[in-house]
A protein has these predicted regions:
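Short beta-strand->loop
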Residues: 54, 163-168
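PLP-dependent enzyme catalytic core of the Aspartate aminotransferase-like
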Residues: 2, 9, 159-160, 171-178
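PLP-dependent aminotransferase class I/II
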Residues: 47-133
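Active-site pre-lysine segment of PLP-dependent enzymes
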Residues: 1-18, 22-57
Length: 178
């Protein structure tokens, strides 16, 4: 969090607008402390916009529900002006009506997930051809270091009904086996 606050101060001094995606912050070990989705932070740093996809946090891909928060009135005005008139579907509206009823269950599930993530990380590290990158999200990025290409490993595991994403063709990975 300290590094993020340093980056935020740096961007503020240079009049740079920072957009921070907190879609996976609920899975971090100290999610309440890690979030910048707080009025005092947003008011202190008007060049900050925090976005969060609810569908990623709650694992509901069709939900199409998210948050954008900023104290920059121009940004908020722009978003409101350019937002579709019907920007929420009935499923998302229903979710908002029942959200608070299940919030404690969700928080408990996140705590269990955090404990399980650590155990899973330790198991993955035992695979001799994987370099596992530590994560605070609900997934791990792994580099396949030998034995298979990432494409081949994804294909082999799919035969056992294990779904992985081959990131070797993604921008920034330069064809490496992730």
């Amino acid at each position: 969090l300290n590094e993020l606050m340093d980056l935020l101060a740096w961007t503020q001094q240079r009049n740079i607008h920072l957009i921070l995606d907190e879609s996976f912050v609920d899975f971090s070990e100290k999610s309440v402390e890690n979030t910048l989705l707080k009025n005092e932070v947003l008011e202190t740093y008007p060049h900050l916009t925090v976005i969060k996809s609810i569908s990623k946090s709650y694992g509901v891909p069709g939900l199409r529900l998210g948050i954008a928060a900023s104290s920059d009135k121009e940004i908020i005005s722009y978003l409101r002006k350019n937002m579709a008139i019907w920007n929420i579907n009935s499923f998302a509206e229903f979710y908002l009506q029942i959200y608070s009823k299940y919030n404690n269950d969700y928080q408990n599930a996140c705590k269990k997930f955090i404990a399980e993530r650590q155990r899973f990380f330790e198991v993955l590290q035992q695979v001799d051809f994987l370099r596992v990158i530590p994560s605070q999200a609900n997934y791990f990025l792994c580099e396949v270091t030998s034995r298979f290409s990432s494409t081949k490993l994804v294909s082999l595991l799919l035969e056992h009904n294990l779904l992985l994403k081959d990131c070797s063709t993604k921008t920034g990975f330069d064809g490496r086996n992730y």
